[in-house]
Amino acid sequence: MSGKRRAYPSMQYPATEPVATGGSFGYGQQPGAQAYGQQFTPGAGIAGQQLPGATQPNLNGQGAPYGAPGGDQLAQGMSSLNIQPNQQPQPVHQFPSQQQGYINPGAGLGVPPTQAAGPYGVPAAVAPQQQSAQLGYAGPPYGNTYDQQQPQQAAFPFNQLYTADLLKELPPPISDLELPPPPIVLPQGASLTGKPESNASPEYFRCTLNVIPNNNSLLKKSKLPLAVVVNPYQCLRDEDEPVPVVEDTLISRCRRCRSYINPLITFVDRNTKWRCNLCNLTNDVPSGFDFDKDTQQRVDRMARVELNYSVVEFVAPKEYMVRLPQPLVYLFVLDVSTHAIQNGYLATVARTILDSLDQIPNKDGRARVGFIGVDSSLHFFTIPQDSEDENDAQETSMLVVSDLDDVIVPAAENLLAPLQQSRQNIENLLNNFHSYFENNVNPNFALGPALKAGHRLINNIGGKMIVFTSTLPNKGIGALSIRDEEAHSGKAKESSALLSPNDSFYKSFAVECNKSQVTVDMFLASSSYQDVATLSNLPRYTAGQTHFYPAWTAAREEDITKLSKEISNHLSMNINLEAVLRVRGSAGLRMNAFYGNFFNRSSDLCSFPTFPRDQSYLIEISIDEHITKPLAAFQAAVLHTTSFGERRIRVMTLEVPIGKELNQIYASADQLAITNYFTHKAVEKALSSSLIDAREYLNRSLLDIFQVFKKELVAGNLGSSSPLQLCNNLKMLPLLLHSLTKYIAFRPGKVPSDHRAYALNLLASSPIQRLIKFIYPTIYSLHDMADECGLPEELEETYVNEAGEEVTEPIDGDIVLPEPINDTSTLLAPYGLYLIDSGTDLFLYVGGESVPQLLLDVFGVDNPGYIKYGKSELPELNNEFNERLRNVINRVREGKDRITYQNLQIVIGQSKQRTGVPDRIQEDLTPLRLWCFSHLVEDRVGGGTAYREYLNQIREKLSS
């Protein structure tokens, strides 16, 4: 980010004196100096000597290829790119969000030695923004046909392999984390239209390898995983994610593999048939494809949505319905025990549900809601429909069931009330819900019996059971006890003793719920043990989610804000009912294992009672036979019922080339998707074996990749003097996997089991971009951010007015964010201000040596001792910098793809230069600093080595 920076002066320090006892950090220092990534002592503060260029630490320019420096450094950095002297590096092409880096060059296109290379080694002449002018599609009206001579596999270029020396690129160029995956290079005629939208974008559907090995031996030799990541929905609400819809209910599917027609098929036999791109079978083209039944006119076939877009949604005919569309049902199961009353949880939840009633999807007016209060008894509520005549109006009544051994659901009407027809009575109940139990002193919570009763109530319809609890279940079936954390935390048997389910009831019950089309979501909020490891089985097997709020109390406004926003977002999310996901692959490719929150109904069918919008799924693939075709295809289909009662199928199609050389496979490997794969496998090992095994698996997998690359793809063997080389498109993989071992889910040492279990759940269900944030937090330097940061991006909009004139007007875009810096204390100045985004929380780190003017602008005080630290919010002050800072925080918090809201933790650094922060506050800040600094994953945190040390260890192992 270029631009002017606010001139907050730095404190002046003697050149020979280290700051805040941390020593000066840096690269190329004298032997006695503290080096990059060395252990940081939280109580000692942050290193103080600012490095040259520390505000922009070795970040790639937006237009640089993998591993390349910014534009003004290109002349110095050519050697690091491994580009021939007569080649010039090209800008990184910013692929639109709707495309997969799909390149469809002309058949037989060579790569002349003097031709410029694109960002991944693909010739710039066929880069996406130029391809429409380069391709020159010709041939039959509906694309290439198999009746014609097909280009040989070698006739189109693969991504070229460029290597990087990781030890020479420190700090690692974290801007690479924002790059798209290596482009998928397909031959001319691979799609019907040649448009980028013909192949699924990586946001929806991506493969760990954008060139797939042609046999299993080559895959095993590569040590790279083969899997696809499916993320069918990008936003919580339909209006934020317009996906093309096929509305005429005309669906053409392959007779053999049952895949759906898509832009990557081929028309043959004078366009009367289409050849499946998965199994190669020829199918008849439906007669209605060329005819509009509404206008009774012949139409252009190529105008059909499913032939132009790889991500589409079909409105399904009645043949796709097992039963009539059911209404959307929300059954709220609320903890009414004394603890939930005393900490304000029950009152907060009831008020939030009341305020969110208008946001519940109810387009067709059929949504229903019900409520069950739970202590040692079950409290049901009959909610009559509203009446305009007060004389005929019925009141809401509460029915109590005390027998927990054989729970009988009352045979009363209106236990599930229609939201639209009973709106007033529902509001009255929620307004008075707390008063029903305000004098309750019952400390017990019978969750198991409540779940069974709720299941009986809605199992004929399906829907959601949303559980709000602040108490460990301790009555009836499924009662849990507190585990011995002290004896097992941080030890070899931690997984089996603390992270495994403590009662088999919850998993078996979850499977029954899945069969009945019932999803269970958990909102757990307490200052005491909740047994997240056991209770999270309910959402895991019913396609729900676990939400965890440790140390929650209504006495803190920030806690109320977070819980309320997340409940509201959850209730406003468009959900799909009675859904199944199936992923198909070309001949020779088998879907081998499935990861995510769902239940495997059969070997290749994943069942979702309700399909969430904020999760993703990973499918591991095996190669069962030698692949002779030049291309492989995958197709994911989600059959579901919308919240407004329409049966639909969302279809995503992805095609990738087949390679027979190891360099082709490595040059097209997707480091983020591979990280996702290894994360799922590590979670699996942590739960089935041990945390030690999970960490060893990650380290061993990475070492295997380095060994293969050195042995097979690096020219020559220089022994101990050889650099640590890896291809450019994988050079962030070591950083990500090493950082993953320091994440709270895997780090060694004592971690509360609820926190660790919750972190494992997040890793196992989060989309890639959020997952990467958990593993490698984003840090923004705020005290020196450019003047445009914190303000809306200045854009222009062009339109034609009523007079037919073209008009261009300025409009505001998104808030501009500063460029991220590396996760290391070497780049944190003691006078600086930094925002750390961990994915779950935000940390505003205030350097202990911050100048008074900065403190005044941000907090309205000139002494750090007066700053409200911990969970807090910035005060709204009447100055530009404060407003920009709040804009940055709000922008980071935004997310149309997630329900979570991040609390802000204000952390004050330590200083030896003045005594602005009293000793009592310094003691309070120590654990907060430890928590904040645990996200500096390039340093020695979380019981692990610094990143530089880690790379040197790998280098030594490779040389031994």
From Swiss-Prot:
Region entry Zinc finger-like, spans: 254-279
Record's compositionally biased regions (Low complexity): 27-39
GO molecular function per UniProt: SNARE binding; zinc ion binding
Compositionally skewed regions (Polar residues) per UniProt: 52-61, 76-102
A Pfam family assignment: Sec23_helical
GO cellular component, as recorded: COPII vesicle coat; endoplasmic reticulum exit site; endoplasmic reticulum membrane; Golgi membrane
Membrane topology annotation: Peripheral membrane protein
Record: residues binding Zn(2+): C254, C257, C276, C279
GO biological process: COPII-coated vesicle cargo loading; intracellular protein transport
CDD domains: Sec24-like
Region Disordered, residue ranges: 1-110
Predominant cellular place of this UniProt entry's protein: cytoplasm
Assigned keywords, A-Z: Cytoplasm, Cytoplasmic vesicle, Endoplasmic reticulum, ER-Golgi transport, Golgi apparatus, Membrane, Metal-binding, Protein transport, Transport, Zinc
Protein localization: Cytoplasm; Cytoplasmic vesicle, COPII-coated vesicle membrane; Endoplasmic reticulum membrane; Golgi apparatus membrane
Family: Belongs to the SEC23/SEC24 family. SEC24 subfamily.
Job description of the protein: Component of the coat protein complex II (COPII) which promotes the formation of transport vesicles from the endoplasmic reticulum (ER). The coat has two main functions, the physical deformation of the endoplasmic reticulum membrane into vesicles and the selection of cargo molecules.
Protein known as: Protein transport protein SEC24
